[in-house]
């Protein structure tokens, strides 16, 4: 892709470079990407039909799914060619590459506050089994935690997240608190009310403006069109087209074959 030609040069904002990456299950190829750079723009979207490989590719980036072949690297001024595909998931997170649902928490047993505390504690863990002072960790993050809980309407931090929407929102808040360099979000606004969706989008714009690269997968194309600077269209495991939202919306073949007229 033309947008990928800048790979290998110094970049001002973190990028993920995917090269010759493939994944198959039971003989069926679900991801087959020759070359793709994510992060040419502050906020990018991955779209495509069900089974296109979008979520699997995201999970491969954080090594939640092992690669059959290929390499995935983080490109940034501090670490120009960091091989993510050779790292365990927790180490990738310590390098600032964070994906939603990356930390598994039992929402039914932890309060909203405890689950956030768990997230920041795990993120600051320098090596497995190191013992942390949870009070010290919380003290460093308390103001930001309280601000985000208030902003998104989760005012009772001692309550338990019950609905799917509350759990999704809590996961987004955890990602924001971690201040990632590169943030991967899978369906971040699915099931959320319109007012909260707007707040999520506003917060992601602020995060991107501060230097974080954001990549989202979403079937709600209104979110894609209104939030993303660039969009990558995937189908049958391949990255087929890249462009700004307007050019993707006007690509008639893709609209007619995959997205439907109602999404134009």
Name every feature range the model reports, one short phrase each.
Residues 16, 30-33:
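Conserved structural motif at the start of ABC-family nucleotide-binding domains
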Residues 224-226:
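A short, surface-exposed alpha-helical micro-motif characterized by mixed small hydrophobic
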Residues 47-49:
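The feature captures the beta-strand-to-loop junction immediately N-terminal to the Walker
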Residues 62:
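Helix-to-loop junction immediately C-terminal to a conserved catalytic motif
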Residues 71-93, 132-134:
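ABC ATPase NBD Q-loop/coupling interface
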Residues 218-219:
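H-loop/switch region of ABC-family ATPase nucleotide-binding domains
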Residues 183-186:
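Catalytic Walker B motif of ABC-type/P-loop ATPase nucleotide-binding domains
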């Amino acid at each position: 892709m033309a947008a990928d030609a800048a790979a290998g040069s110094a970049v001002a904002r973190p990028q993920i470079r995917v090269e010759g990456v493939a994944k198959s299950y039971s003989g069926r190829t679900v991801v087959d990407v020759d070359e793709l750079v994510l992060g040419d723009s502050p906020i990018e979207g991955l779209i495509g039909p069900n089974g296109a490989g979008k979520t699997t590719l995201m999970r491969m980036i954080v090594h939640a799914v092992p690669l059959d072949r290929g390499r995935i690297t983080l490109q940034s001024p501090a670490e120009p060619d960091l091989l993510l595909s050779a790292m365990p998931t927790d180490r990738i997170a310590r390098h600032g590459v964070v994906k939603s649902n990356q930390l598994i928490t039992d929402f039914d047993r932890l309060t909203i506050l405890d689950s956030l505390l768990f997230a920041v504690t795990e993120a600051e863990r320098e090596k497995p089994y190191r013992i942390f002072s949870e009070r010290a960790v919380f003290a460093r993050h308390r103001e930001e935690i309280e601000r985000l809980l208030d902003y998104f309407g989760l005012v009772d931090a001692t309550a338990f997240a019950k609905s799917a929407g509350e759990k999704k929102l809590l996961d987004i808040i955890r990602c924001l608190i971690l201040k990632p360099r590169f943030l991967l979000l899978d369906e971040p606004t699915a099931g959320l009310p319109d007012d909260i969706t707007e707040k999520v989008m506003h917060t992601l714009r602020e995060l991107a403006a501060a230097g974080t690269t954001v990549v989202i997968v979403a079937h709600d194309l209104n979110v894609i069109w209104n939030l993303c600077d660039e969009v990558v269209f995937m189908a049958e495991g391949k990255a087929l087209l890249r462009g700004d939202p307007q050019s993707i919306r006007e690509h008639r073949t893709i609209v007619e074959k995959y997205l439907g007229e109602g999404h134009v």
